[in-house]
Each structure stands twice: as structure tokens, then as C-alpha cells.
């Protein structure tokens, strides 16, 4: 039962107020109190000698933590304002000052779900014997694996009634409310627009995700998060599945002079190494700055933050424009090759226009020209538009240059579009120079360092030097964590590096796509807040087929939510599945590693063109070495090894350490390493994640694309390791189906390379994506039958079916895009293949309703025609349809005709598209 009050009486000798347990009654007097003690005696006290606190309220069924330690003997808190008394039944504590050292949490009433998930985890560990492969390969099914005994013991020690940890929120599917940011966020390690957003999101949210594609500065972002947590007196653990990732963080901090607050713990060997080499040095006087300089820094950082936000926005616009320019120039190069225009004719046509076109007007002119039937007279309105809107002086030009005029407009569009981009680039570059972008960023970093350094100086000047060792640091952990608020560890060993029950303020999981959910759950139990850093398009944790079947059976047995599926999800994907839109996720967009054309493939294929490429490069970065021998046996290919060896010795003599050779199979990688010159490094892709080389050589080994070597995560990582050059060694006979990762990669390499050297002339032209995407925009604006989509009712339905359902909802079609009203003349490279009447039909602006194409290399894949019943029963239209069918058959482009009276269109499109792509239905 609670006491009605607590009372402190002033000791006459010490003049200190002391808690008195033996007071029975208190009576308020005019000038003080009359106090009756439990022995029956009463005394009067002046008001200056008494502190009286009446009972306010109780909290029952609670857990009480003092300085992070659970007081398990108490379950109720009585609140007296400035003081708290803890009790269980009639057993009570002395009063505690109400302060930040005390945490009061409601006891969880139901942990059935949590226990079920943990039972599922235990069954996996007990039956499979371990968690996931360290070195996954195709042919080696039994590599060294992490001992499950450590994990099972750790699971048994986790307190599922602990409600303060991130594990509690993760298992309950809760994400606590967003917090208010500190007034000053610092970036002593530099930043860009995305990194600033990521740091702020991490500090505001209890659970957050940072998606960091290759070369986007994940480590720099982590360092800035750490700096802000330190100045807020927070503790942080940084973990990864392997030591190399966290050691990278350590090396960066030590290299910049900030090793003073970092402890590299984890397994026994790491701990021993850390404490054996531990030397406490006094904080450097270089970190000390004047009060005036600190005040200036705190003022300037706010002003610079606003300026830099604008600078970052414009810097990203500039990079995006440069990527658009590169794409436009490559596409224009294809147009010049596939739709050549005589320079004299071009000059003559230039003179026919008295008004200069712009790129948008060129597209509108193309639309108008496509609507003109060659044998029909021009309407008066059309003549006026040609003369006054587009500046065409001589209307006889339409007849004189009937074959060349649309090609001329196509060329003109690219010239003007490229000119527009170059003008925009120049304008933004001038803006950035005038606003001192680089100088302001450097000042921003310097003032951030000033604030960070002075905090460290003041903190470490006050800390007493203590001798910590591997055998005593746990017993002195309160002091240890003050000296070393940043702990580095593997995910497996974090819980063994800290006292039981200790919670970090923050946990950062790096390379999270490789971390399974069991080890993640253990780490979550050690922290209040979590930042998960990784890339869902890179390598994930690996589970062998036998273990996968066992784990899937347990999932069904325990009825486990898909979000906690050990087989399907690493921790990054688990959080996405669990929280969907209810977790803050920031994509680091700015890419700083690869040649623009190299990362361009990854950007288009895997990142939905969201990356902002900050690199440059004048060289062409791709090479394809074709061998005339097909795939080898035993998962290796000696001819590819020989070709790789020859190329390296010819092109990288004396620079062998700049080259990495990647193979999908361990056997091939081992034989590569045996034959390569010293310094060149050959391995499977799993050893290259998180690293980079000037040149990467990828050996396909096989001559057919199978599921193992065509893994999208593997190809993405392989390509994005290359800084300057990416080379593929492959059999000449290798088929390249649309939609496969290797197929699209090779197609992209051919598409972007030197046209004269590598493009094999066939009968089908590439799709001019930019021209028709922009043209479709103008085309739609001309039509009023629908606010968003133009065309007949049937075409509108088909547009929505393709664009909103079929293409976006099937991962197999991630590289397929669509254009409308595509001109046959833009598809047919060689008119000499056809008789005069068919060639004339092609020239007469005949079009395909829908063209599906591979957006990686612009190759046409499938044509779709929507046939109205009454219209297409017309004899003249039937003749046109026959000619169109013949043309498409001749150039080898599959055609699907859909009738407005047909049915099951969606399934027919999917079947036809799969067949055209070489996929099995």
C-alpha cells in the first residue's frame, strides 16, 4: 500500500535534508508543520526545516530501470512529484529522485507472438545447424557456417518482456512516432542532398532504412550519423555480417583523427587485439577552439545549411542533365546510322524554314506531317499552320522531299534537344559558380568539425583515464561506454560484447542485405533505435536448398508472418515487408564511383533511373571478348581463362592490382587465380561486394544463361565494382534473351559502344526511345478524347492494360517499355528488301499502334495492333494490314493483333510477349 506522503527533515548538524521513514502524521501550521512520529511523539518544525511531498498517483504492473538496470524486485511506482518510491506489495524502496536515469515501462501482458517467432528461430537453428552461408557458391553445398550454438544461447537469454528495445517494436510490428530534430545537425564528413535527408531521417525515427546503391557514400552517411549521436551523448553500435565492413568505418574514423571514441569488439580475437593495442591518449589540443569561433560556427551552420540545400538541388539537376545529354547523344548516333540524311538535303531543308524550330515544335511538326496523306490535298488550316506556326516557306517541299522530310524532323529534334540540354547545363554551372557551391560546402564541413571537435575536447578533458582490459571492461562498462560510445562488432558477437540488459541508443546495421533476420533480431535486442543500411539490389544472405525446405516447413507449422520468413527475407527486406509505407526509407541517389556509362546500366536495369550520376569519363568503358569455344565442363572454362589472362597482360602490365576478375563459380575463380599475373585478383562476386577496381572482367563460364549466373543481385554487384572499365568474356554463340540480366547487359554494352566497331547491322532498327517518348507526350496533348491518354476507346483500354498492369507488375518485364503510334519507316532500315508498293506503304507514315521494346538497348520486341471490327473489315484496310504483317514478318518483329470483339487480351499479350522474349509460358 502506498504512503500518503513522504517527508524530508533537515539535519541540524549537516544542514542536509534526510528522508524520514518513521513519520506517522503531518499537520500543517501557520508557520510550519507539526510532525507526529511512529513512537507517538510530536514536534513542531519550521517550514525551512521540512520538505513535504504528498502522494499523487501510482503506476501498477510496471518494469523499473535505473541507469539501464532492471529492478526486478519492484512492480509498482508511487509518484510524489519530485520523488518516486518503488514497491512490490508491502516491500518498498527509499525515495528516488525523479530524473532521466529512471525508466518506467508497462509490463507486456502478451508475448505469444514473440514466443512463436522465437520458437521458429530455434527450430531453424536446431534443425539446420547454422544460419547462413559465409561464402555461397553453386558447387560447394557445405562451406564453413556460423555455429548455431552461440545463437541458440543468445536467443534463450533475450528477455521478451523488454519493451524498450527495437526488437520489441520489430516483433510487434510497431514503429514509434517521429521525434523532433535537434536544432543543429552537423556534417563533419561532408554530405550531399540525399545523405542529409538520410541523416535527418535516422535521427528522427526509431526504425529507419537507408538504401545505398553502389558508390553512393553509405559509409560517409554512417559517419555523419555517428557524429550527431556523439554530440547528443548517445551510444551506438555498428555491426555487419563480416568484419571488413565495420573495420572500414573504423579505418575511416582513425584516418581522420577520430579513433578516440571507437572500440572494435566482437569475437574473442578482435577484443584481444583491441585491448592489447589500446593506448589512451589525451585529447588533442587541435580540437580546442575559442568561444567566439564556436559561436560563429553555430550561427554559420544554420545559414550555410539553407544555401547548400539550393546548391545540392542544382548540382543534382546538373548531373541529371549530363546523363540526359549522354543518352541523347548515344541515341542520336543510332539515328544517324539507321536513318542517314544527306547533308545537302539537310541544308536545303534548313533553308525552307524561315522560322527557327525548337525541339517541342519539331515534335508537333512531326505529328502534323504524319497526319498528312500524300495523295490528298492539304486543307487550308494545315497550310496556314505549316506556314505561320512552323515557318515552312514553300509547301512544294512536302512533295519534293516526301521521303526525307520526317527523317529531317527526327534529326532536327535531336539537334535541338541536345542544344537545349547543353544550354541548361551551362546555366546551372554558372549558377553554382556564382553561389560559391564548393566554398560553401567546405565551410559547412569546417564549421561542423568545429562543433564536433569542441564537444569531444570538452568531454575527454573531463574523463578520468581508466585502464580497461579484456577481462574487466564489462564490469566497468558504465565508464567504458563513456570513453568508447561507438562499438564495432559482427552481428554474431554484439551481444557477447556488452553486459546483459545493456541497450545502445542506436544500432546501425551495414551491408544489411547480407544479414539474416535471426542475427538481426539478436542485435535489435541490444538497442533502442535502429538504422538499417544496405541495398536490396545487392547480394543477400544465402540458404542452401535442403535448409530452405526445412525452414519453409517450420514457417507453415508455426504460421509465421511472411515478414519474418527466414528464407525469403534478409533484415532489409523484412522491414520493408513488415512496415511497407510506414517506415522511413531514404535512397542515396548520388553516385560517385563508376564511369557514367557503366553505372548507366545498373541505373536503368535495377534502380529505375533514380541514381544521379556525379562521375565523368571520356573513354568508352566496355569491352566484349568473344570466344569461339562454348561453355566448359566442371563449372570452369579454360578458353575464357586464357583470354582473360592475355587481355590483362596486354592492357594492364605493371597495374595488375587495378584489375578484378569475377566468376560465378568457385572452381573457375580458383583456376583464374592460379593463372593470373601476381596482383590481379580473381574471385566469386561475394568477395567483391563493398569493393571497387579500376577494371572488372566478368567471365560467364557457360554459353547459356542459367538462373544461377543470371542472378540480378550478382550482375548488379559485378558491374558496379568497375570504376573505369568493364569487360565481359563470353562465348560467341551465347544467346541473349530479352529480360535476362546478362542478356540485357550485353545488349546495353553493344548499344552504347562505338557504333562502327560493334553494332552488327540487321534488318531491324533500334527504337528511338527519346524521340518517341517526347513525341508521345506531344501526341497525347493533341488528342482530347481522354484527359490523360489519347486514341480510340479500345486503344485507351490497351494503353492502360499495358502501362498500368502488365508491364509494371511482372519483374520479368522490368526491361520492357512501350511507345505509341510508332512509324514503320523508323523500324525498317533497308527499303530495298521490299517491292515498290510495299516500300511506298512504309514511306506513307504507316504506324504500329503499340510497340514494346527493350529499354536497355532499344531493341524492338513485340508489335501490337488493335483492330476495330467494322474498320478492319474494310477491303482497303485489310490490304494495309496484310502489307504491315508482311513488313513486320520480313524484318523479324513479332506481331500480335487484338480485335475489339476479342477476349482474354491480357493473357494473349503475356503469352506473345513471353514468346518474343524467349521466355517459357
Predicted regions span which residues?
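Conserved helicase NTPase catalytic core signature
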Residues: 109, 117-190, 357, 362-503
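ASCE P-loop NTPase helicase motor core
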Residues: 88-97, 104-105, 175-288, 346-360, ...
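A short beta-strand element within the Helicase C-terminal
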Residues: 502-508, 691-702, 725-728
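Accessory, charged alpha-helical segments in nucleic-acid-processing enzymes
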Residues: 1-188, 280-292, 306, 320, ...
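Conserved helicase/translocase motor-coupling segment
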Residues: 609-675
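Nucleic-acid endo/exonuclease domains
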Residues: 763-921
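Charged C-terminal transducer/switch regions of large nucleotide-driven machines
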Residues: 1-62, 66, 260, 267-272, ...
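Helicase C-terminal subdomain and adjacent C-terminal extension
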Residues: 546-586, 619, 680, 705-814
